[in-house]
Every structure is written in C-alpha cells, then in structure tokens.
Amino acid sequence: MGGEGFTILHASDFQLDVPLGGLRWIPESIEAEVLGAPEVAAQRVFDFALQHQVDLLALTGNLLCPTNSSARSLSFLEEQFTRMHEHGIPVVWATGSIDPLENWPTSMTWPESTIRFDRGSVGRRVMTLGGIDVEVLGCGGDAAGNIHPEWFDGLSRGERQLVIGGGTVDSFKRLDASDLWVLGGRNYAEH
C-alpha cells in the first residue's frame, strides 16, 4: 500500500563511561566540553528522536559499561529512556559486548516501552510502528560483538520483520531472517 511507513532512529556505541580520546592534551578552555562530549552526543540523539517524533529508537549496544560507570551516567540513561516513554517513543535496545543485561544494577527501573534484548539469543516482539504491525527480532552480539546468522535458523519469516542487533554479522551472505537489519558496530578501541 502506498503511503505506509514508519521512522526508526538508530544509534550505537554511546560509551558514556569512556572519555573522549585521541587527544594529546586538552586546552583548559575546552576541558569541560571535551569531558562532557559523550553525554552531549547521546543527549542529541534523544532530543532528535523527540523533535522528529520517530516511531522507534533503536539502540544497538555498548551504551555504557554498567560495572565501570558513574551513577551520573546510569541516571542519565534512565532519564532519557523515561523521556522517550513519556512521549510515546518506544526504545528497542540490543546489548553489545560491554553492556550485557546481567551486569546492570537491579535497582535501575526501565519504562514499559523499553524493550531490551540480551546477547547470545534471539527475542521476538510484535510492535505497531506508524500504524503497521512489525515483528522485531532482537539480539545482542556474543562476547566478541558478533551476531551469527545461524541464531535465526528455524525462525519463521514474516512479511514485516526487522532485526535489531547489538553487534556485527560474520557473513552477510546468509542474512535471510529479515529484509531490514539495524546493527551496532564493534568498539574500535577493541581492534
């Protein structure tokens, strides 16, 4: 049908717990801006989603390392997910190599509209995006940040499917599970 569609905003690898790197030294006059750059960049993603009223915010891995992060970074992320919920924008988050679900503090609360997919297995959820029912297949990558096409073997193929994954795919020749794949990348610091 003509005119059907929905909008997905995709972001990955916020790494809120990692300071901006690659600089030999930071001039004192911009030190605060450099130190706050990861949070400012992430804030802009959430602001963009609200400004453009996207149908879905897809986050694919490595948002932050929950065991090494400050309370400020954890609180920031929780606040942003709540903002999305309050404005009717669901967040689908597929974990990456540094942010598996088992490492998150149990005290953190997640809005109902936040769907989290962990690494190593495929989860399924039907969502209505822009008035269209879409089956979302989600998974985080393995510990090395890879998503293996065989994880999707045996899953039924629907007309409107979307894969959201927190990692990279080892072989693009076998991507039969869906026509649309939204994937995170590997952390370049790991290479």
Question: What label would you give each PLM region?
Answer:
Residues 56, 67-191:
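His/Asp/Glu-rich metal-coordinating catalytic cores
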Residues 1-75:
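N-terminal active-site segment of His-dependent metallophosphoesterases
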